[in-house]
C-alpha cells in the first residue's frame, strides 16, 4: 500500500485542462484507490519543504482549479508552479523574435530572497534527467522535483524555423524545433604540410552517440530514455513521442551542450614543419609558439632593407668554466670538468670543525698558505630539518658591477674581480642542534693570477721543486729559461697562476722550504713545529741525491739565486761562464746594450765576501779547505787552464770556485792543494790570494768568537 500519493485531479483528462478555470489550485490527498480519484479533498496551501517523502509516487498530475477566468499558473503536487499556456505563447514569440530567455532554478526554502516576476516560475526540474512527458493531450505530466538538477543559464536557438510554426496548431501540441548543428571540417593533412588542393571530408558523428541525449553524457537533458529515430526531416515530431527526439537531421537544443563538452574544432595549427600541434584559440597558439622560441622581429633600416637582429638569449643556469664556455650544474661537477677536460688539478677538500673558532682560525691560515680570501656569495639556505648551508666563493671571482649611467659619476675604484668564475669555493653545513661545522670545497684557483708571496707549497708541489734541484745538481741548465722552469713545475697546479716575475722572486724561498722539509724528514721527522709528517709523504718514495761538491753546508743563498733569476728575466746574460779568467757572455742579445763587466765583477766580489762571512759565521774554528773548494766530493767541477767550468750552479761551492780572481787561476793549475794547504798558513797570505785585503777588518767587525 502506498504511503502517500500526491495527486491533483480535474474534471477531465483531455486538452480542456488548458481552458480558463474559475478556482485556485489545491493539493488533494488520496489513498491510492481509483474509486476515490473523483473526490477532491480541499487542503490549505502547503510549501515545498513541508511535503513529506512523496517522491516515490508512481506519477504526479497537474490540477487547475476553477478561477476567475484568468489562469495565472499551474501547480504540481509537490508545490512547483509552471507557467500557463499564455506564457508559453509569449515564450514562442520571444523564440521567434530571437530574444534570449534565461531559465534558472528556484531556490526552495530561501526566505527573503524570493524573486518576483514570471521568470521565477520556470524551474530547472524540467531539465532533470528523469523528466519524461507523454502527450499533453493525455492530461498527465510526470515531473521530478528532487531538486538535484544544477543551476544553468540556457540560450534558446535563433528563429531559423519560425516560418514552420503553425499558428492554428493547438498550444498543447507546441514543440520547440531543433537546430541542425554545424558540420565540422577536417583536412587530410596537417596545416603545416598543406600544399593546397587537399581533399576535405566531413566528420561523421557516430549514430549511437547522436542518438544519446545529453543526459547520458552530461547528466542533463530532456531525454531520459532512448527512443527510435525518425526518418522524417520535419523538425516537428509526432505527438506520441517525447518532446524532443534527436536524430541525424534533427537535433535538440540540448545538443549544443553535448557539443560543448566534446572537443572543439582545431582551428589553429603550428606552422613548424615537424610539429603537429592543434589548438582552438589564439591564446593557446601563442603559448605553444613559446616552445619553439620567441619569434625574431623584423627591423628595417632607413633604406627599407631588413636588418639582422640578434636577440639576447637568457642566461643559462649553472657555473661557467673559466677556461671554456661550458656550464656545470654544480661546483663539484665543475671540478670534475676542470680535471677531465683541461687537466687542471682541482682537489675536493672535506673537513669538520668542532666550533666556529676553529673554522675561523683555519680560514685565516688559508690567506697565507693558499692566497685565498673567501666572501659570501649568497645568503644562507635552509634544507630539511633546520640544516643551514652557507656558500663562500673566492673574492676575485665574478664580473665587475656595472656603473650607473648618470651625469656625475665618481671615479671608479679599482676592482679585484677577474671577470671569470674561480673554482675556489666553500660550502659550510651547520646543524642547529650540533655545534660542529662540515666543510666542503676547493682551495685552488682558476681564471686569475695569485699572490706568490702567500703561497706555501704542498707535498706534490715540493716534489716539483725537488725535481728542479736534482736537475741543477746534475748540471742541467734549468734556470736558464723560465719556460724550462715551468716545464719542470707543470701546468696543472698552482704554479700556472704565478707570473714570471713572481716565479723568479719566490723560487729561492721554495728552495729553502724544500731543503728544510727534507732535513726535517731525514732528521727529527717534524716540520717547523707543525706536527709529524704524515705517512703518505711523497718523499718516502723519492731518494735525495747528494750534492755534487760534497755535503752542502749552506742552503741556497736567496740573494745569489735571486740575482741569477733576475738576470734571466732581464735577458742580460744567461748563462755566465769563465774561460781562463776571461768573462764571456755566450748568449748575449745583440739588441741589448753591451754588458758592463766591471759591475758583474763587483757583484761577484760582494757575493764572494758575503758567502765567506756566512761560512765563518757558522763554524770558524772547524773551517777546512775542503769546505771552501769542495774537494771532499768525488766529482770535481773546478776546471782551470783554459777549460770551461760548468754552467752557473745554484750551490755556493760552485759559485765560490767560479768567482776566484784572475791572478789565482794560473798558479792554482800547478799547485798540489793537499800539500800546500795541509799545514797552517798566514791569514795575510790567504787574504792576498783571495783578494780580500780587508778581511781581518771585516772579521773584527763581525765579532766572531
From Swiss-Prot:
Q: Where are the zinc fingers (C2H2-type)?
A: 268-292, 319-342
User: Which terms in the Gene Ontology molecular function aspect does this entry carry?
Assistant: DNA-binding transcription factor activity, RNA polymerase II-specific; RNA polymerase II cis-regulatory region sequence-specific DNA binding; RNA polymerase II transcription regulatory region sequence-specific DNA binding; zinc ion binding
* Region ranges (Disordered): 215-239
One GO cellular component term, please give it.
Answer: transcription regulator complex
Q: Which domain of life is it from?
A: Eukaryota
Q: Extract one GO BP annotation from the record.
A: regulation of transcription by RNA polymerase II
Keywords, ordered alphabetically: Metal-binding, Repeat, Zinc, Zinc-finger
Q: What happens when the gene is disrupted?
A: RNAi-mediated knockdown reduces expression of homeobox protein lin-39 in vulval precursor cells at the larval L3 stage.
- Read off the PANTHER family from this record: PROTEIN CBG06911, PROTEIN CBG17840
What job does this protein perform? Probable transcription factor. Positively modulates expression of homeobox protein lin-39, perhaps by binding to regulatory regions of the lin-39 gene, acting in the vulval lineage.
Q: What is this protein called?
A: Zinc finger transcription factor family protein 17
Species of origin reads Caenorhabditis elegans
Q: What is the lineage of its organism?
A: Eukaryota, Metazoa, Ecdysozoa, Nematoda, Chromadorea
Amino acid at each position: 500500500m502506498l504511503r502517500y500519493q500526491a495527486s491533483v485531479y480535474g474534471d477531465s483528462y483531455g486538452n480542456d485542462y488548458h481552458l480558463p478555470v474559475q478556482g485556485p489550485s489545491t493539493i488533494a490527498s488520496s489513498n491510492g484507490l481509483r474509486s476515490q480519484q473523483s473526490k477532491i479533498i480541499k487542503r490549505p496551501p502547503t510549501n515545498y519543504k513541508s511535503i513529506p517523502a512523496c517522491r516515490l509516487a508512481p506519477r504526479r498530475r497537474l490540477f487547475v482549479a476553477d478561477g476567475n477566468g484568468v489562469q495565472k499558473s499551474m501547480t504540481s503536487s509537490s508545490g512547483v508552479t509552471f507557467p500557463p499556456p499564455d506564457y508559453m505563447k509569449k515564450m514562442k514569440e520571444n523564440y521567434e523574435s530571437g530574444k534570449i530567455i534565461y531559465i534558472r532554478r528556484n531556490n526552495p526554502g530561501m526566505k527573503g530572497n524570493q524573486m518576483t516576476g514570471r521568470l521565477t516560475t520556470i524551474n530547472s526540474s524540467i531539465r532533470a534527467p528523469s523528466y519524461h512527458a507523454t502527450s499533453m493531450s493525455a492530461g498527465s505530466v510526470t515531473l521530478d522535483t528532487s531538486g538535484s538538477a544544477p543551476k544553468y543559464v540556457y540560450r534558446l536557438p535563433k528563429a531559423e524555423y519560425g516560418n514552420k510554426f503553425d499558428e492554428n496548431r493547438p498550444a498543447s501540441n507546441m514543440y520547440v524545433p531543433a537546430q541542425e548543428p554545424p558540420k565540422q571540417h577536417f583536412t587530410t593533412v596537417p596545416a603545416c604540410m598543406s600544399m593546397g588542393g587537399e581533399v576535405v571530408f566531413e566528420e561523421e558523428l557516430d549514430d549511437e552517440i547522436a542518438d544519446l541525449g545529453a543526459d547520458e553524457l552530461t547528466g542533463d537533458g530532456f531525454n531520459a530514455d532512448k527512443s527510435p529515430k525518425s526518418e522524417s526531416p520535419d523538425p516537428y515530431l509526432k505527438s506520441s513521442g517525447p518532446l524532443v527526439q534527436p536524430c541525424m537531421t534533427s537535433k535538440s537544443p540540448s545538443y549544443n551542450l553535448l557539443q560543448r563538452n566534446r572537443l572543439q574544432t582545431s582551428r589553429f595549427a603550428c606552422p613548424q614543419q615537424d610539429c603537429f600541434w592543434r589548438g582552438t584559440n589564439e591564446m593557446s597558439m601563442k603559448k605553444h609558439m613559446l616552445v619553439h622560441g620567441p619569434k625574431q622581429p623584423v627591423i628595417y633600416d632607413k633604406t627599407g632593407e631588413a636588418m639582422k637582429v640578434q636577440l639576447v638569449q637568457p642566461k643559462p643556469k649553472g657555473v661557467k668554466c673559466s677556461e671554456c664556455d661550458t656550464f656545470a650544474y654544480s661546483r663539484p661537477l665543475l671540478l670534475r670538468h676542470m680535471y677531465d677536460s683541461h687537466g687542471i688539478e682541482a682537489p675536493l677538500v672535506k673537513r669538520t670543525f668542532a666550533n666556529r673558532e676553529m673554522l675561523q682560525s683555519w680560514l685565516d691560515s688559508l690567506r697565507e698558505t693558499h692566497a685565498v680570501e673567501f666572501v659570501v656569495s649568497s645568503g644562507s639556505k635552509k634544507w630539511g630539518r633546520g640544516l643551514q648551508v652557507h656558500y663562500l666563493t673566492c673574492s676575485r671571482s665574478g664580473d665587475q658591477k656595472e656603473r650607473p649611467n648618470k651625469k656625475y659619476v665618481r671615479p671608479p675604484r679599482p676592482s679585484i674581480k677577474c671577470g671569470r668564475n674561480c673554482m675556489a669555493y666553500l660550502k659550510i653545513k651547520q646543524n642547529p642542534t650540533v655545534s660542529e661545522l662540515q666543510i666542503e670545497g676547493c682551495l685552488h684557483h682558476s681564471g686569475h693570477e695569485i699572490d706568490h708571496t702567500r703561497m706555501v707549497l704542498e707535498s706534490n708541489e715540493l716534489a716539483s721543486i725537488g725535481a728542479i734541484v736534482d736537475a741543477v745538481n746534475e748540471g742541467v741548465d734549468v734556470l736558464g729559461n723560465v719556460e724550462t722552469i715551468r716545464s719542470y713545475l707543470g701546468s696543472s697546479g698552482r704554479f700556472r697562476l704565478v707570473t714570471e716575475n713572481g716565479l723568479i722572486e719566490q723560487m729561492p724561498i721554495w728552495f729553502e722550504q724544500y731543503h728544510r722539509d727534507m732535513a726535517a724528514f731525514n732528521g727529527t721527522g717534524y716540520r717547523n713545529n707543525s706536527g709529524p709528517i704524515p705517512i703518505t709523504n711523497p718523499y718516502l718514495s723519492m731518494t735525495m741525491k747528494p750534492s755534487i761538491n760534497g755535503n752542502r753546508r749552506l742552503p741556497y743563498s736567496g740573494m745569489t739565486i735571486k740575482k741569477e733569476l733576475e738576470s734571466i728575466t732581464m735577458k742580460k746574460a744567461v748563462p755566465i761562464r769563465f774561460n781562463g779568467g776571461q768573462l764571456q757572455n755566450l748568449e748575449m742579445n745583440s739588441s741589448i746594450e753591451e754588458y758592463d763587466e766591471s759591475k758583474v765583477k763587483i757583484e761577484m766580489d760582494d757575493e764572494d765576501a758575503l758567502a765567506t762571512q756566512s761560512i765563518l759565521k757558522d763554524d770558524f774554528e772547524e773551517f777546512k779547505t775542503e769546505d771552501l773548494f769542495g774537494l771532499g766530493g768525488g766529482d770535481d767541477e773546478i776546471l782551470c787552464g783554459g777549460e770551461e767550468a760548468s754552467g752557473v750552479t745554484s750551490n755556493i761551492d760552485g759559485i765560490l770556485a767560479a768567482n776566484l780572481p784572475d791572478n789565482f787561476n794560473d798558479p792554482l793549475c800547478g799547485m798540489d792543494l793537499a800539500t800546500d794547504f795541509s799545514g797552517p798558513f798566514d791569514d795575510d797570505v790567504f787574504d792576498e790570494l783571495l783578494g780580500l785585503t780587508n778581511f781581518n777588518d771585516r772579521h773584527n767587525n763581525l765579532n766572531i768568537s
